Amino acid sequence: MKYTIDELDKMEGHKFEYAVADLLRHNGYREVQVTQASNDYGIDILARRKNVKYAIQCKRYTGHVGNKAVQEAGLGMDFYHCDAAAVITNSSYTKQAVKLAETTGVRLWDRSFLISLSQNYKDDEYERPVRRPVERNLKIADVPEND
């Protein structure tokens, strides 16, 4: 199912996780699975793209995502023996979260990335996406001063 950003914004946490898993699956990620709700070590989705295994934390927020999500994603990556960690949100990140992600290597997938996943959604999950979702490396300079 293709999702609009407005639909994603209104979803409850667990439903949002399943929607993100579906979006990833239909954008070329493989072996996509939603982890158990409890004892997930901060990781909501495990997925593979090319030869990289991702540990992904989902945050459906109305505010900015902070340090805690970045810390949990990094720890969860180690627990699940993944190659990379990411936090995906329908929102944005605090400066502190961006700074921590820069030093730990956790990838921050923001609202723009989520929208690109939705726009590139292919009905047949085995088709290649129209365009590869653009993953930006967020830097402190990308975060407005009032955050």
Where are these regions (language model features)?
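Mixed-charge (Asp/Glu-Lys/Arg
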Residues: 1-147
